[in-house]
Amino acid sequence: MEGERKNNNKRWYFTREQLENSPSRRFGVDSDKELSYRQQAANLLQDMGQRLNVSQLTINTAIVYMHRFYMIQSFTQFHRYSMAPAALFLAAKVEEQPKKLEHVIKVAHTCLHPQESLPDTRSEAYLQQVQDLVILESIILQTLGFELTIDHPHTHVVKCTQLVRASKDLAQTSYFMATNSLHLTTFSLQYTPPVVACVCIHLACKWSNWEIPVSTDGKHWWEYVDATVTLELLDELTHEFLQILEKTPSRLKRIRNWRAYQAAMKTKPDDRGADENTSEQTILNMISQTSSDTTIAGLMSMSTASTSAVPSLPSSEESSSSLTSVDMLQGERWLSSQPPFKLEAAQGHRTSESLALIGVDHSLQQDGSSAFGSQKQASKSVPSAKVSLKEYRAKHAEELAAQKRQLENMEANVKSQYAYAAQNLLSHDSHSSVILKMPIESSENPERPFLDKADKSALKMRLPVASGDKAVSSKPEEIKMRIKVHSAGDKHNSIEDSVTKSREHKEKQRTHPSNHHHHHNHHSHRHSHLQLPAGPVSKRPSDPKHSSQTSTLAHKTYSLSSTLSSSSSTRKRGPPEETGAAVFDHPAKIAKSTKSSLNFPFPPLPTMTQLPGHSSDTSGLPFSQPSCKTRVPHMKLDKGPPGANGHNATQSIDYQDTVNMLHSLLSAQGVQPTQAPAFEFVHSYGEYMNPRAGAISSRSGTTDKPRPPPLPSEPPPPLPPLPK
């Protein structure tokens, strides 16, 4: 397999004789004309790529496709301006930046015919262009043998300049020359990418009067890149590169207005040979073309800000290996200004423009960096053109602030709606039956996505008031809870018993103040046949299991307490034993135990941001099972056989449960009730004591006797377990 791959790689590298005998040459196109056609096609690919907003990597890949294609096909058979859009269309897909066929055709038309209007997409000419481009793409694929993975010299330039800790200017110049070699020469058809990278670095060093020192191992820097490279080969290819640059018309030199090179125009004159003077002047002329900035911006794809003036060329060619002036810099100083490339370790396949520089051949870097590091001389500080994350965030601060304000407004609206609805419910007339609809968490709920955007912990809660009649049936995914208001007849059965128990619980609470906080988390809010979607703090995979209606009472209460208390676990409420006493006790006991105090004090509840340390898993909290078991005899005296949910099938949830549930919901939404008595019940208490006959008759359909609702003075005592 490896040998096959090597043979395939060698297939696309040609000797000078093969280049002189190319298909275009056989059809009568001379060498200079063929090179000019290649440069024009590369020029069009660069222009189109910038307009299509694809990466420089994609443009470079398309240029290599073009060079290889015309080693098999002739320019006389396939026009360069027809083939270039197809090559770019294919390269964009290979490099994972696909563009629409329509966009590619329109951009090609704009580049080739800037004065003409865009073709109508329904016209015959446009449809013919579409068909031609698709056919050409197929021809390119077949001509290339579907070998679409391209290794570029830029990757090796980056690795080598890192290895030798080159300065920012040298790294930028070398990278720039690598792009130049693709646009203007046929080096990509003659030499492997490491060799081309060495030529580009050597040319940059020679022109910039920089020298990369010999390592402590006695090796030259290019030996770490490619062992086959010699100084003679580098000098020969550098001379060839400069000759091509001299012949190339200025209109094809798409390297313009680069400040680093323009600054080189101000270098001091130096004694040198006439041929080298001509060569240097060629580079300077090539670079200092005054034309549009947009072309070089796309070609470079890197920061060119604040590059210092570059020294002149050395006086002789031999001096390129014996100069003493060395300017070294940390390898990281220039990385931020490079157009990043990404390569795989094995085959150099890049799927995006960014190069994971961390993953670049660390073994090579470890071998060479220590050797070159010992030769490092005085460093020259070059200002970095890096754009930091802070600067980027500052640039987009206004946009982020606007989005944040919008989200906060949405969240505040949802919270205010819940608070308003809860206060209406708590202060409502006793003769209205209140229906709470809480949707089970499901993907079919059409109102859920909006709530997720505003506050993902939002519970959907509707509080319509029915006028004594039976409420409209709820949706399949919603659960109804009818809060019944019962008559005063049942509340006198166990007055003394509940008062005594209330006092005992207060005494217990005084003796166990340390257990109050976590004990309340498990026993403050228990709703045995209510299913709540978990909030963001307590969202666990086990919640659907715990909240199923047929589960045991222990699972039900444990799930609900973990769901509700995890978001409000730092608040302090009434005594724990009293917080659960009225939940499953006889209604008469509840009525009496809550009659003694009409005010319901609620301390401020913490918001979600004040609870960073509280886990949604309540398994670590103390669960006072023994104290719950002491309540079992009272349960057996007052209750009938338990139903599927832990109480009688026809028994309704008490009013106290609703109060506790609503305050849990408010705390989960971050709404803080006032320290003063939050709800005043005195004005309507007389109506609870003397319910009207109409309210009783409206509830005659149930088997329970009407009872007045318990008016909460403190949270209910702990919940006893279900009798076996």
Swiss-Prot record:
Short sequence motif Nuclear localization signal: positions: 253-270
Comp. bias (Basic and acidic residues): 483-507
Linked residues for Glycyl lysine isopeptide (Lys-Gly) (interchain with G-Cter in SUMO2): 342, 415, 480
Recorded coiled-coil stretches: 384-425
GO cellular component entries: cyclin/CDK positive transcription elongation factor complex; cytosol; nucleus; P-TEFb complex
ADP-ribosylserine modified-residue sites: 416, 473-474, 548, 551, 562
Biological process per Gene Ontology, one example term: response to xenobiotic stimulus
Location in or out of the cell: Nucleus
Modified residues (N6-(ADP-ribosyl)lysine): 484
Family in the record: Belongs to the cyclin family. Cyclin C subfamily.
The name this protein goes by in its record: Cyclin-T1
